[in-house]
Design a protein with these regions (language model features):
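Acidic, proline/glycine-rich low-complexity IDRs
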Residues: 162-198
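Generic structural signal for short, solvent-exposed loop/turn connectors between secondary structure elements
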Residues: 41-44, 129-133
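A surface-exposed partner-binding patch
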Residues: 1-121, 173, 190-198
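Intrinsic-disorder-associated interaction segments
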Residues: 3, 7, 83, 87-90, ...
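Short, surface-exposed beta-strand/loop micro-motifs that present aromatic residues
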Residues: 123-128
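Compact, glycine/acidic-enriched structural inserts
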Residues: 137-168
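Structured loops at beta-to-helix junctions and adjacent beta-edge loops in soluble globular domains
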Residues: 117-119, 130, 137-140
Length: 198
């Protein structure tokens, strides 16, 4: 099962359990105009990422925000702080990184890149590189020694890492490092679906 089919399952889960929205907020598709703008500014962007935008204009999956246009989207009334639930705007995040990254790293070594996601604290970012690989960088420690290729493609990032069998790699170096302390409704749901068994 790929990420598109998993998204269908996740949408049904949120319909059946409104509180799960806190772990999974999938939006309406991005506008054609926005998708075209992404293609024009980042011609190397993968078709799979564009297909993601056609499926959802950014999203939240557990603690991970994936960039979209930044357009307003549905937020349930029970959410205490709606401002903390808005997915970051891709072009805004790209501009901010273009100003902050050169202060602590050699951006020429990165080559062309597109920020596609980050954690809720804006400490860890996922960058799509020109070859399609996904680089995880640490903007909190500002140490390039923490850089790592976390997936070979955007689809692999979603399928195998965020909602798949390598989810543990986001917080642990080894599956054996995982502990009950790391459990939440998101990880339990991944287990129930058989998408990640530990």
């Amino acid at each position: 099962m790929g990420w598109r089919e998993k998204f269908d399952v996740l949408r049904e889960k949120v319909k059946a359990d409104e509180k799960f929205w806190g772990y999974c907020d999938l939006h309406n598709p991005a506008s054609v105009t926005f998708i075209q703008a992404v293609q024009e500014k980042y011609p190397f962007v993968s078709e799979e990422y564009l297909d993601f935008l056609r499926n959802t204009d950014g999203c939240t999956l557990n603690i991970w925000f994936f960039m979209g246009s930044g357009a307003p989207h549905f937020i349930p009334e029970w959410v205490f702080d709606p401002s903390g639930c808005r997915c970051p705007a891709l072009f805004g995040e790209a501009q901010a990184l273009s100003e902050s990254l050169p202060k602590w790293r050699n951006v020429a070594e990165l080559g062309l890149y597109l920020p596609i996601g980050r954690d809720g604290c804006a400490e860890t970012y996922f960058l799509m590189l020109e070859d399609g690989q996904i680089l995880e960088i640490d903007c909190e420690t500002k140490k390039t020694s923490w850089d790592r290729i976390i997936a070979n493609s955007f689809g692999e990032l979603l399928d195998n890492v965020i909602i798949g069998e390598k989810y543990y790699t986001l917080g642990c170096d080894d599956p054996g490092d995982w502990s009950p302390y790391n459990e939440n409704d998101w990880t339990r749901f991944l287990n129930e679906q058989g998408w990640w068994v530990h």
